[in-house]
Amino acid sequence: MNMNHENKDRREFLRSAAGLVLSSGLTMAQQPAPTPVPPPKKARITSSVMLWTLKGTFDEKLATAADAGIQSVELINEYEAWSEADAAKYKHIIASYGMHMDTILASHDWVKRPVSLVNPTHREAFLADVRHALSWAKKLDVPQIILMSGNVQPDMTHEAQYASLVESAKRATDLAEAAEVTLIIENLNSKVNHPGYFLTSAAEALKAVKEVDHPRFRFLYDLYHEYVQNGDPLPILKEAHPYVNVFHVADAPGRHDPGTGEMKWADLYTAIGKSGYAGYVALEYLPVPVDQTSSLIKAVTAMRSSLNAAQTPEKPA
């Protein structure tokens, strides 16, 4: 039996069923819990996609991810416009596809407001954003919240900004521990996509995670951003993997499909697979083909092939 075809048929059925439930006017409590589509057996690495990279309505993006066989989805701040009923609706739809939500973002408008980790005068506003994101994480059963360092403060030394980042992270981690949610800090490039961003080095992000030294503060290692800013992301990957909860994937230059640029994805995936890593690998690229579902299927298939080849037979991805 073709399991990929079977799972796709199942997702098509569940999507239709979810739509009928929601259009019928019945409440979530009146409906039986959906049966999730199971991930690959014995998987220890979970595939995900950052939904902002996909075209369409939010519902269409979810359907695209499900049709591609992706196991989880990442949000920015789409939930900000949701009512309690909307939150329940989307939890139901996502579960009906056999997926879950793995991350949301705190301080989505960090470029526009003084909410950075690197300036002590921004700290209370930053912590207020963390509290707000934690409340939504609990509502949506999201285990992780992405933190952005914020931009360089021109009137502060690099050392002072780094010290502030560590202190802000420690304060936020206390809040996250109480909520049983994990904070993950992301490296970004300032050369192309995010001019002025402070935490542009995976090595420095790793240093901060080690210094905070708490299981609720981890690293979101964006391989694309590291390549654009500093070159080959592989050396830091080999050191960082015990501290990473999420890897982000896009090729450079262009931030498009893996395999369309210069990055050596087979080597990167092999290193992740051999490392014993047991977290998320999330696609955060802008699909080149018109058919974004086919693009995601190709990317996920290549990723799983390399990961599985690198892992022991008992622990496939």
Predicted features and spans:
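Histidine-acidic metal/acid-base catalytic patches
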Residues: 2-46, 50, 55-66, 199-221, ...
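Active-site acidic/histidine proton-transfer and metal-coordination neighborhood
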Residues: 12-25, 34-41, 96, 113-218, ...
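Active-site-proximal loop/turn and secondary-structure-junction residues that shape catalytic pockets
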Residues: 53-55, 79, 107-110, 151-153, ...
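Catalytic domains of carbohydrate-active enzymes, especially glycoside hydrolases
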Residues: 61-78, 141
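Short glycine/serine/threonine/alanine-rich loop segments
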Residues: 70, 99, 142, 181, ...
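Glycine-rich, proline-tolerant flexible connector loops at the mouths of alpha/beta enzymes
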Residues: 75-95, 149-153, 193
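Mid-chain, structured segments of secreted extracytoplasmic proteins
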Residues: 90-120
